Amino acid sequence: MKNRLVIIVFMVVTMLCASLALPLEEKEDEKDEKRSLEVAGAVMEGANLGMSVLQTILQAIGDVSRKIAVGVDNESGRSWTAQNAYFRSGTSDVILPHTVPSGKALLYDGQKNRGPVATGVVGVITYTMGDGNTLAVMFSVPYDYNWYSNWWNVKIYHGKVRASQKMYEDLYYYRSPFKGDNGWHERNLGYGLKSKGFMNSSGAALLQIKVMKA
């Protein structure tokens, strides 16, 4: 009888411990999922994209004098598929998120080349949209702020076009780029879409863009 009572008490205690541990495990899983979403190369809910997420990406890059965190929210109503990233200067250790459904945001980063080199981080990323056209995002974080400033641009190209030096020059010199002036800027992109974006003026640059229906 005594042994049976001990077994029953042990089973009750075990069940109570398990019931308490489950919510804790679920909370830890939620924390891990949230942390995993706030890294470059990931896709997250577009509504949750904000400067705090981009700051987390910058911190993960570490102590680099020229770096950028990019977040692009897809509210276009169509899914996007990654094409490529082109860097005129600088680099990234991150692969572009392959698929960005509507309602989601892609996260990406870039940094100057390692070592004592006088370069910034300048490049273009491209995505094929559901209608077959190409969304291009250009960013420029210079090394020398005595001569240059932060700039960014977003444009839709007809058909499938890969990011390249030619595309960079088009977006930087000829397509009315926006200065990284710590302010928001809007533009009609055509094809039934418009954009709204922000870039700061720092060497630790934040670029947040939302592409939505016009």
Swiss-Prot record:
Residues 1-21 form the signal peptide. GO terms for biological process: cytolysis in another organism; monoatomic cation transport; pore complex assembly. GO terms for molecular function: channel activity; toxin activity. Residues 38-47 are annotated as: Plays an important role in the hemolytic activity. A motif (Cell attachment site, crucial for protein stability) lies at residues 179-181. Phosphocholine binds at S89, V122, S140, P142, Y168, Y172, Y173. Its main location: secreted. The record marks Y148 as: Important in the initial contact with the lipid membrane. It is found in: Secreted; Nematocyst; Target cell membrane. Residues 140-155 are annotated as: Trp-rich region, which is important for the binding to lipid membrane. Residues 22-35 form a propeptide. GO terms for cellular component: extracellular region; nematocyst; other organism cell membrane; pore complex. Residues 46-65 are annotated as: N-terminal region. Keywords: Cleavage on pair of basic residues, Cytolysis, Ion transport, Membrane, Nematocyst, Secreted, Signal, Target cell membrane, Target membrane, Toxin, Transmembrane, Transport. Pore-forming protein that forms cation-selective hydrophilic pores in cell membranes and causes cytolysis. Pore formation is a multi-step process that involves specific recognition of membrane sphingomyelin (but neither cholesterol nor phosphatidylcholine) using aromatic rich region and adjacent phosphocholine (POC) binding site, firm binding to the membrane (mainly driven by hydrophobic interactions) accompanied by the transfer of the N-terminal region to the lipid-water interface and finally pore formation after oligomerization of monomers. Octamer or nonamer in membranes. Monomer in the soluble state. Composed of a long N-terminal alpha-helix and a core region rich in beta-sheet structures. Before the pore formation, the alpha-helix binds the lipid membrane, partitions into the lipid-water interface and stabilizes the monomeric molecule on the membrane. Finally, it traverses the bilayer, thus forming the transmembrane pore. Belongs to the actinoporin family. Sea anemone subfamily. This is Nigrelysin. It comes from Anthopleura nigrescens (Sea anemone).
